[in-house]
Design a protein with these regions (language model features):
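Interhelical loop/hinge segments that connect adjacent transmembrane helices in multipass membrane
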Residues: 3, 15-58, 97, 101-116, ...
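Helix-loop interface residues and adjacent transmembrane-helix termini in multi-pass membrane transporters
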Residues: 59, 68-71, 182-183, 210
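Membrane-proximal transmembrane or re-entrant/amphipathic helices at the cytosolic face
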Residues: 264-312
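Hydrophobic alpha-helical transmembrane segments in multi-pass integral membrane proteins
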Residues: 50-55, 201-204, 257-271
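Specific pore-lining/lateral-gate transmembrane helices of multi-pass inner-membrane transport
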Residues: 76-193
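Interfacial/gating helices of multi-pass transporter permease domains
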Residues: 36-50, 65-85, 117, 150-159, ...
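Hydrophobic alpha-helical transmembrane segments
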Residues: 1-23, 43, 194-199, 213-234, ...
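Alpha-helical transmembrane segments
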Residues: 25, 176-184, 232-246
């Protein structure tokens, strides 16, 4: 059943899209000889190569951990990875819907609108990934015990070590797969990913024998950091990220505030259920309040949208 559900989820959307093609393509007048398949082959080959590299890259740490150490540590590591990826999915949800828009603006040479959308997207990524990263560091014990049970306590530190990848992958995903890809700079994404894969492999070779799944977590965090840095440097000519814009500085200020708040709550209540519940609720309230005080564009837009929905 699991295999059937997985396959259906993967290909189901494509099957429905095939039937919807009839609204856009006239199959009665369709002729194969009119297709210029070769002009699509090279871009598709780059995507194929990138997917292969990413597939090897994301599974390398788990394979090496099981080969060098044992399956028990793989289980601890896998638990931390799964929760981290679930949290990361919240941030990455925006990227999927933005790629067609980026591609359209780039193809029509609307570079001013392209840059404005890119700046806004990067700011959104930073504004969402930073508090999630901090939350994952503080809430790792509660999350591991909630979803995996007390037997997976060794997964807690691994999850905390890997928490920075939420920020790194979110930025590199938006910059690489959306912005640079839309600009036709797929090679930069491929080079960056290859460098990350090599660094990950080398670090795993040195760290896993001594530190086990913690070493794998360190290797993954450093590798993802290097992917992001290399991508930013190589792509700077085509798009430069303004990390210290007024909007982004607001996110740093708000994130620093919730760090102090969580440290205070942790000292007051200890690491338990009360800290978990109060920490999440108060962090969300404080974070949004600071953004509202600083007149953050996303909060203002959300407020306007809610008012319009209520009074509509």
């Amino acid at each position: 059943y699991y295999a059937a559900i997985s396959v259906l989820a993967e290909v189901g959307g494509n099957i429905f899209n095939f039937f919807r093609l009839r609204k856009f393509i006239n199959f009665h007048n369709f002729r194969w000889r009119d297709l210029d398949l070769m002009r699509h082959f090279r871009p598709a080959l780059k995507i194929f190569m990138l997917n292969i590299i990413i597939s090897i890259y994301v599974n390398l740490d788990t394979v090496m951990l099981g080969f060098i150490r044992n399956e028990t540590l793989v289980g601890y590591y896998d638990a931390s990875v799964r929760i981290t990826k679930a949290i990361l999915g919240i941030v990455q949800a925006l990227g999927t819907v933005l790629l067609p828009r980026f591609a359209s603006l780039a193809n029509n040479n609307q570079m001013q609108e392209f840059k404005a959308l890119a700046d806004k997207s990067i700011s959104f990524i930073i504004g969402t990934s930073l508090p999630l990263m901090v939350g994952m560091i503080f809430m790792a014990p509660s999350l591991i015990f909630l979803f995996c049970g007390p037997l997976f306590a060794p997964s807690i530190l691994a999850m905390q070590i890997m928490s920075p990848i939420i920020l790194f992958i979110a930025i590199s995903g938006m910059l690489g797969m959306r912005i640079l890809y839309a600009l036709g700079k797929e090679n930069i994404v491929i080079y960056s990913t290859v460098i990350g894969a090599v660094i990950n492999f080398l670090l795993n070779c040195f760290l896993i024998p001594s530190y086990g799944h913690y070493g794998a977590g360190i290797a993954t965090s450093i590798a993802e950091f290097m992917v992001t840095i290399v991508m930013i440097i190589l792509g700077w000519k085509y798009y430069s990220i303004h990390f210290f814009s007024k909007q982004n500085v607001t996110y740093y200020l708000a994130t620093g505030t919730i760090i102090l708040l969580l440290l205070f709550l942790l000292a007051l209540f200890g690491d338990g259920n009360l800290f978990f519940i109060l920490g999440i609720l108060m962090s969300v309230i404080v974070y949004i309040s600071i953004l509202y005080w600083r007149k953050d564009v996303f909060i203002i837009q959300m407020k306007t949208l809610l008012i319009n929905k209520i009074w509509k």
